[in-house]
A protein has these predicted regions:
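Non-transmembrane, interaction-prone alpha-helical and coil segments associated with secretion
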Residues: 82, 162-169, 176-187, 191-243, ...
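Secondary-structure-rich domain cores
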Residues: 105, 595-601
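Intrinsically disordered, low-complexity segments enriched in serine/proline and basic residues
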Residues: 2-16, 20-24, 31-34
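Intrinsically disordered, low-complexity regulatory segments enriched in Ser/Thr/Pro
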Residues: 103, 111-172, 227, 247, ...
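Amphipathic, interaction-prone secondary-structure segments
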Residues: 80-136, 454, 531-532, 536-545
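Terminal, regulation- and interaction-focused segments at domain boundaries
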Residues: 29-81
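Long, charged low-complexity terminal regions
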Residues: 271-573
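Ampiphathic alpha-helical segments that act as solvent-exposed interaction surfaces
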Residues: 29, 38, 71, 75-80, ...
Length: 601
C-alpha cells in the first residue's frame, strides 16, 4: 500500500480521487448512498451510548496501535458475503512455462455478475524486488475485470497491466494490482513439492505467504471504474469489496504457481500441497507512511471503521451467556494461543511478537475461567483486559467479536460514508469556539505550544513518490507540505479565536487569517465521535506504526512485523478458503490457522 498523493490545500474531492492503493475510497458516490445510511451508524451508536467505549479511550494511539483483525475486517466480510450470496470461483485459463512465467485467468460468479482476474507473471532479479511505489518491474501484475475477457481485451491487458501506473485502463477494469514472489520461500516450496515432499514446518512455518503484493489500485485510477460507477445492487457496492476479491485471487495464484513449477521440475514425483498446507499461506503485503495521510484526511471513514467495532463490542459485553458460548470463547482463545505459539520470536518492537502473545493469551484464558460463571462475564473479561493494557484489551476485543452475530447487510451499509460537509461563514466566533471545545478539547493534552510538537512536516518525496517526514529545522516546507497536521492547525485556530469578539462572524476571522480555512473545514467535517486519533503527526514522539496497524487490522491483516518506525509487513487471508472450497458449507472460522505439524515424504 502506498501514499495518497495530495498536497496541502487540496479539496476533499481531490484528496479522495488521488488516494492510492487499498486506501482508494468510495466517497465520490455520495449521491448513491441510501438516504438512511449516512446516519445509520450514528443511530446505532446512540442506542448504545451508555455501553460503547468513549473516544477518549478508543482513539488513543496506543489502543489503535494494538488493534487486531476481527469478524468485521474487510477480508472476513467479503468472504462471508461470497458464501451468503452463493458466489463460485475458479481458474479458467493457465499458460505458464516451467519458471511460472505467463498468464492466468480466474473468474468469480457473483449472482448474475461475472468478474475475471487476469494475471501476468514473469521473473526479475532479486535485486529488483522492492515494496516501493517507484518500482517499475514486478513478477506479478493483475487486473480485476468486469465480465469475461475476450481475445481483444486480453491483448490490451497484456500491454497495459504490466505497466501499472504507466498503463491506461478503461471502466471495464475494476482493480489493478502487482507484487513479487517471496525471495526466501518460493523456490524452496517448489523444490520440496517437486521432490514429492511437503514443506518443513520449521523452515517455512512462520513465512505466512508465497507472494507479496505491493499495491491495489481502484476507484477511477488510470481510467478504471470509480466507486460511483457501481449501481446500488452491485456486488462491489461496498467499500473495498473489489480490492479484496482481487487480493483473494492474488493469493490463489501463489499456490497455483508453486504447484505448476513443481510439476514442471519434478514430473511424476511432484505433489501438491496437502490438507495441512493447502490453506496455510496467505498473501503478503508491505505498507508505509502512505496510510497515515489517508487516516488523517478522512475522519468520517475512520469513525465508521472504529464505530462498527465499538458497536459490536458493546453488544457482546452485555450479552447473556448461552450454554455453548463459554466453550466457543474458550475455543477461540485456545486457537489464538496455538497460532501464535508456532510463530516467530523476531523483534517486532513496538508490538509484541507472536511468542510474547502466548503468555498474554494464557492470562486471558485464566481470567475467563474466573469470570465465566459470574454476572456479565463478557463485560467482566473486557474490563479486566482493559486494566492489563492495550495489547491485552484489543486481543480480547478481537476474541469477543467472534461471538457477535450482526447482520452483514447492515454492516455493509454502515461502512458507506457521506464525507460532504460545508462550513457556515455566518457562524459566530462563540459558536465556533464552542464546537472546537466540544470536539477537540483533548488538544490541550498534547503540549502543542512546545517546540517538539512542530518538529516535523510531511511531504511527498520527489525521489520515492512516497510521504516522508522532514525536520522543520533542516528543510522548509515552501508550500509543499501534506496537510496532515490536524492537531496543530486546530490548536492554532483556537488560539486565534481567543483574540476575536464572540459575536464576530467566523468569515471575518478567515479574511484576516486565511491560513485557518482548512482548520475550520476540518472542524465542521469532524462531527463523529471516533473520527480523530488523539495524536499529533508532527511531534517528535509520533509513531506512524500505530495508526497503520489499526488500518491494516481493519483490512483483515495480521502478523505485524515492523521494519522501522515507518513501515511494516503483514499477511492477509492466511487460512482462508481457497477458490474451489467456496460453497454453502464454508465457515468463517478460518483465521488464526495452526502451523502444519508434519512433513510427509
Amino acid at each position: 500500500m502506498h501514499p495518497p498523493r495530495v498536497g496541502g490545500g487540496c479539496s476533499a474531492w481531490q484528496a479522495r480521487v488521488e488516494t492510492l492503493p487499498l486506501e482508494r475510497t468510495y466517497a465520490a458516490a455520495v449521491s448513491l448512498i441510501p438516504p438512511t445510511s449516512a446516519d445509520a451508524l450514528q443511530a446505532e451508536l446512540a442506542a448504545r451510548s451508555g455501553r460503547i467505549r468513549p473516544a477518549a479511550y478508543a482513539m488513543r494511539p496506543e489502543v489503535l496501535g494494538a488493534a487486531r483483525l476481527s469478524r468485521y475486517s474487510f477480508s472476513r466480510t467479503m468472504l462471508r458475503r461470497a458464501v451468503a450470496d452463493g458466489w463460485t470461483a475458479g481458474r479458467v485459463h493457465q499458460d505458464l512455462d516451467a519458471e511460472g512465467r505467463g498468464e492466468t485467468i480466474y473468474v468469480v460468479d457473483a449472482g448474475t455478475q461475472r468478474f475475471s482476474f487476469v494475471v501476468f507473471t514473469t521473473t526479475i532479479d532479486e535485486s529488483a524486488h522492492t515494496d516501493r511505489v517507484i518500482a517499475d518491474r514486478w513478477e506479478v501484475a493483475g487486473a480485476l475485470v468486469d465480465g469475461d475477457v475476450d481475445d481483444d481485451l486480453l491483448a490490451r491487458l497484456r500491454i497495459e497491466v504490466p505497466e501499472q501506473e504507466s498503463g491506461r485502463m478503461d471502466p471495464r477494469i475494476l482493480s489493478l494490482t502487482r507484487g513479487n514472489r517471496s525471495v526466501r520461500f518460493f523456490g524452496y516450496l517448489v523444490d520440496e513439492l517437486a521432490a514429492g515432499r511437503q514443506p518443513d514446518p520449521d523452515q517455512v512455518g512462520d513465512a505466512g505467504y508465497i507472494l507479496r503484493s505491493t499495491a491495489f489500485y481502484a476507484n477511477g485510477k488510470f481510467g478504471m471504474r470509480s466507486f460511483a460507477g457501481y449501481p446500488g445492487d452491485h456486488p462491489f457496492r461496498v467499500p473495498y469489496r473489489a480490492q479484496f476479491v482481487a487480493a483473494w485471487m492474488f493469493r490463489e495464484l501463489g499456490y497455483d504457481m508453486v504447484e505448476h513449477c513443481a510439476r514442471a521440475k519434478g514430473g511424476d514425483n511432484a505433489v501438491g500441497f496437502d490438507g495441512e498446507w493447502c490453506r496455510y499461506f496467505g498473501l503478503g503485503n508491505a505498507t508505509g507512511l502512505g496510510l497515515v495521510p489517508y487516516a488523517l484526511k478522512h475522519p468520517r471513514v475512520l469513525d465508521a471503521w472504529v464505530g462498527v467495532r465499538e458497536m459490536a463490542l458493546a453488544d457482546v459485553r452485555e450479552r447473556v451467556v448461552a450454554p455453548t458460548d463459554g466453550a466457543v470463547l474458550r475455543g477461540w482463545i485456545a486457537k489464538a494461543r496455538e497460532h501464535f505459539a508456532s510463530g516467530s520470536n523476531d523483534d517486532c518492537t513496538p508490538f509484541l511478537n507472536s511468542q510474547a502473545l502466548v503468555p498474554l493469551l494464557d492470562d486471558v484464558a485464566e481470567a475467563w475461567g474466573r469470570v465465566a460463571d459470574g454476572a456479565d462475564p463478557y463485560d467482566a473479561l473486557y474490563l479486566w483486559a482493559e486494566n492489563q493494557g492495550p495489547e491485552t484489551s484489543e486481543m480480547v476485543v478481537s476474541l469477543l467479536l467472534e461471538l457477535h452475530d450482526g447482520d452483514d447487510d447492515l454492516f455493509d451499509l454502515l461502512f458507506l460514508v457521506d464525507e460532504h460537509s460545508s462550513a457556515d461563514p455566518t457562524a459566530t466566533v462563540a459558536e465556533v469556539r464552542a464546537k472546537l471545545d466540544e470536539r477537540f478539547g483533548w488538544l490541550g493534552e498534547l503540549n502543542l505550544d512546545e517546540p517538539p510538537a512542530d518538529a516535523f512536516w510531511w511531504v511527498v518525496s520527489d525521489n520515492t513518490e512516497e510521504p516522508r517526514r522532514a525536520r522543520r529545522d533542516r528543510l522548509a516546507p515552501e508550500g509543499r507540505d501534506v496537510a496532515v497536521d490536524v492537531a496543530l492547525r486546530l490548536w492554532r485556530f483556537g488560539r486565534t479565536l481567543e483574540d476575536r469578539h464572540a459575536d464576530e462572524p467566523v468569515a471575518a476571522v478567515l479574511a484576516d487569517h486565511p491560513e485557518h480555512r482548512m482548520a475550520l473545514e476540518r472542524l465542521v467535517a469532524s462531527d463523529r465521535r471516533y473520527g480523530e486519533p488523539r495524536d499529533n503527526t508532527c511531534a517528535t514522539s509520533y509513531l506512524p506504526l500505530q495508526i497503520q496497524r489499526f488500518q491494516l487490522a481493519q483490512y483483515g491483516m495480521d502478523e505485524f512485523k515492523p521494519k522501522d518506525t515507518d513501515w511494516l509487513r503483514v499477511t492477509l487471508f492466511q487460512g482462508a478458503p481457497r477458490l474451489a472450497e467456496l460453497g454453502p458449507d464454508t465457515t468463517d472460522d478460518w483465521v488464526l490457522p495452526a502451523r502444519p505439524t508434519s512433513r510427509k515424504e
